[in-house]
């Protein structure tokens, strides 16, 4: 397995900037820092594995209503615009119990490597250990 400790991983969620302009406003989720940004789409009735990552923390920004988010043992349904902070090594899962796709923007801080995934539970019977494909 690769070394996932080579980059700084924040323990607390970085400050989210909010700036108003004459034309509207914008939120800034990462500012001058190294991160990996992904747009996840979860199909109706599907969910990611219950997983954790040693080498990165994640900020999830919910795009569509109805995302069911589990962090640790706590589970909650999120509305569009909500943010979820996931610390490195913290178990987490994204589910969709609705009838339309749910999108979540993921901003990963640290060393994003696909093989840095520990699966604790998985509906698709994938290996529990480090992976090289898929989440």
What does each model-identified segment do?
Residues 29, 39, 63-66, 85, ...:
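A structural signal for the main folded, soluble domain(s) of proteins
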Residues 14-56:
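A short glycine-rich, His/Asp/Glu-containing loop-to-beta-strand
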Residues 3-20, 93, 97-135:
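Double-stranded beta-helix
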Residues 72-91:
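Short acidic-glycine-tyrosine-enriched beta hairpin
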Residues 47, 59, 66-68, 75, ...:
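Structural motif
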Residues 35, 53-68, 72:
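Glycine- and acidic-residue-biased ligand/ion/polar-headgroup-sensing regions
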